[in-house]
Amino acid sequence: MNADWIAACVIAAMCATAAGCARAETMDRLAERYVKLVLAVGQHDPDYVDAYYGPQEWRKEAQASKRAVSDIDRDAADLLKQVAARAPGEGAEELVQLRHAYLTRQLEALRARVAMLQGTRLRFDEESKALYDVVAPTHTAADFEKVLGEIDRALPRRSGSQASEASLVERYDEFRKEFVIPPDRLDRVFKAAIDGCRSRTLEHIQLPPGESFTVEYVTKKSWSAYNWYQGNYRSIIQVNTDLPIYIDRAIDLACHEGYPGHHVYNALLEKHLMRDRGWQEFSVYALFSPQSLIAEGTANFGVDVAFPRPERLAFEEKVLFPAAGLDPSRASRYYDVLALVEQLVYAGNEAARRYLNGEIDAQAAADWLEKYGLYSRPRAEQRVRFMDQYRSYVINYNLGKDMVAAYVAARGGTPDQSSWRWDVFEDLLSSPRLPSGLIVNH
């Protein structure tokens, strides 16, 4: 049988029609242009390119040319038109449709970030919509005061005049002191947490062979931890030790940054989209883009998927508290209080919204975080520095988690359906879905 005829049959089967094949090839060329534009923006914004593992000559080209921001914007506008002209036809595979929508929205966010680099100032909600495809709900102080009252009643009171005058955040800090991981035990606790997160993830998700990450301990950062994805299924995870690290952060960070969070998310995208399909746009991660809400939302929700509350408490009591030299009998009490404090997570969004809109200054933003988020003063000041650097990115953690949780639950991934919950979660991790595509209409 003629080899050329066989090859033609294979190509026809893959493309279905000549037009479909041409469209796919054209989208690949457009995706390459997108990657190069992201790398070009990175020459003007050091935080913009969060990860890149495509051809190194493209990075070198971006560094050598250092294109003007106005040129980048003009090319991005043209690329958007080219992408719009190549919308997939009716009946196209869902992933192909998602790819087209993803590339469109990522380019729109790139243009918004470029406009900001050129001096455009957006209000908080305008910025989050432009960059992350969503707007966070607004809350008032009254929304948090009821929870603060519950926390006030839950925290112990000590005798003495000074104790009676202590503020709620001071009492919360005092309560938490016994749950700090001693610095000399930090590494062993994190390794134990990582092992637990990884083993639970591997029970449900087949990871690419050779995947791994290393942990580094750093200081003088505005964030508490960071995953630097290197490509080839490898990550570097940095943990900031500027401030005391509490025992609950071990699982939170191990899951969020590692398994089944950022490390798994990036590895699955690399395997299923970049390598298996050749979609080069997934070789680069633009931080200020809709992809980040998916990344942060799945990373935060992944903690609950890997460790539902009863299982987490058992693991803490049996493994992590002893590894940290803490009293396991106090674990349940600690997590009861944390469950209340978690209801204050949107207080951070309000501080950021008011601060970035120019309604309050940095000191007032830290005051708000102390009063309504129960941040210690050093941690509140660190968070304001994070707002200075990353701005409306803060919504991706809490709103992102809630949106991912609702999306997974709407597809039957409820806590009582653990195996299916993992399946829905893995599908989300492996697909180019947009934040607006997560919205559940009741």
Where are these predicted regions, by residue range?
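N-terminal secretory signal peptides that target proteins for export/translocation
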Residues: 1-4
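N-terminal maturation segment of proteins
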Residues: 22-442
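Bacterial N-terminal signal peptides
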Residues: 7-17
